[in-house]
């Protein structure tokens, strides 16, 4: 088993203020001590050690499941503690030794079974351009991996961030909290 860690001070990006829970005022109104850091930003932190240990192949064909156990507040020191156990890489995002989020990463996509679409109302199609807001997401959030800017690659945290964008635009009105995501990489995405 291989164990390592990486740390960063958590922060929200300006665009996160679209969800009031990511502002001091909104976080306090919801009963927290301040602004909750976006789950996709915490996921960005969790991917840093995965990329360090598994490299670009994980971005090309890997997958992960991320679960948010309790909030990370802006400016808290997040330590990402990693344990490699053969087929998966487990990363805990801890604040003062308390696990706030957990990510299990896989080098390949696990068999996801039959992914059928539920019946119901379809959302409108939307075209999203990855330049500007999304192209340097990881760097702006605090992930210091240089491969994204050097190779012009989209950070893996952009995928759940885009899913959140769809949720915010179509399904919720007011504050909400991201609790879990499954992310499957199909290929590198370059800008």
What are these regions (language model features)?
Residues 1-35, 112-176:
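Catalytic strand-loop segment that frames the active site of acyl-thioester-processing enzymes
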Residues 1-10, 59, 63, 70-136, ...:
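HotDog/MaoC-like acyl-thioester-processing domains
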Residues 8, 15-18, 44, 50, ...:
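Generic hydrophobic/packing signal
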């Amino acid at each position: 088993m291989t164990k390592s860690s990486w740390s960063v001070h958590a922060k929200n990006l300006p665009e996160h203020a679209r969800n009031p829970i990511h502002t001091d005022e909104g976080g306090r109104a919801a009963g927290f001590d301040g602004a909750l850091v976006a789950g996709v930003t915490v996921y960005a932190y969790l991917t840093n050690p995965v990329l360090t240990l598994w490299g670009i192949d994980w971005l090309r064909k890997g997958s992960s499941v991320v679960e948010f156990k309790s909030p990370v507040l802006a400016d808290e020191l997040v330590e990402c503690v990693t344990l490699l156990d053969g087929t998966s890489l487990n990363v805990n995002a801890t604040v003062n030794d308390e696990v706030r989020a957990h990510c299990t990463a896989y080098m390949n996509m696990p068999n996801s079974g039959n992914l059928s679409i539920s019946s119901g109302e379809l959302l409108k199609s939307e075209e999203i351009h990855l330049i500007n807001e999304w192209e340097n997401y990881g760097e702006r959030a605090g992930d210091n991996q240089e491969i994204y800017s050097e190779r012009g690659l989209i950070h893996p945290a952009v995928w759940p961030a885009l899913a959140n964008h769809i949720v915010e635009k179509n399904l919720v009105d007011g504050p909400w909290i991201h609790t879990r995501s499954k992310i499957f990489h199909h290929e590198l995405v370059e800008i």
